[in-house]
C-alpha cells in the first residue's frame, strides 16, 4: 500500500533520530494515512480513499464533492 495521501499528496519524509548523546541515525517520518470510505451523495455510492488526517479535515471543510472535483481536475482516477 502506497503511503501517499490522495487529497494532499503528503508522503514519507526522511530525517534523523537523535539520541541524548546527539548521535544521529536515519529514519522515516510516515504520514498518518487512513483508508476511509466516504459517501458521495451526488453519485449515490461510497468512494474509498487513502487520506491523511489533514486530508480528512480538508474534506470536512470543503465537502467531498469539491475535493473529488479537484482530484479529477488533476487527472486522478477515482
Swiss-Prot record:
InterPro entries with a match to the protein in the record: Ribosomal_bL28, Ribosomal_bL28/bL31-like_sf, Ribosomal_bL28_bact-type, Ribosomal_bL28_sf
Protein name from the UniProt record: Large ribosomal subunit protein bL28
One BP term from GO: translation
Pfam family, one: Ribosomal_L28
Keywords assigned by UniProt, alphabetized: Ribonucleoprotein, Ribosomal protein
Any one cellular-component term (Gene Ontology): cytosolic large ribosomal subunit
GO molecular-function term, one example from the UniProt record: structural constituent of ribosome
Record family assignment: Belongs to the bacterial ribosomal protein bL28 family.
Amino acid at each position: 500500500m502506497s503511503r501517499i495521501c490522495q487529497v494532499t499528496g503528503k508522503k514519507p519524509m526522511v530525517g534523523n533520530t537523535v539520541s541524548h548523546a546527539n548521535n544521529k541515525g536515519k529514519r522515516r517520518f510516515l504520514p498518518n494515512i487512513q483508508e476511509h470510505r466516504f459517501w458521495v451523495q451526488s453519485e449515490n455510492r461510497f468512494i474509498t480513499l487513502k487520506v491523511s488526517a489533514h486530508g480528512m479535515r480538508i474534506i470536512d471543510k470543503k465537502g467531498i464533492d469539491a475535493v473529488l472535483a479537484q482530484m479529477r481536475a488533476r487527472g486522478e482516477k477515482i
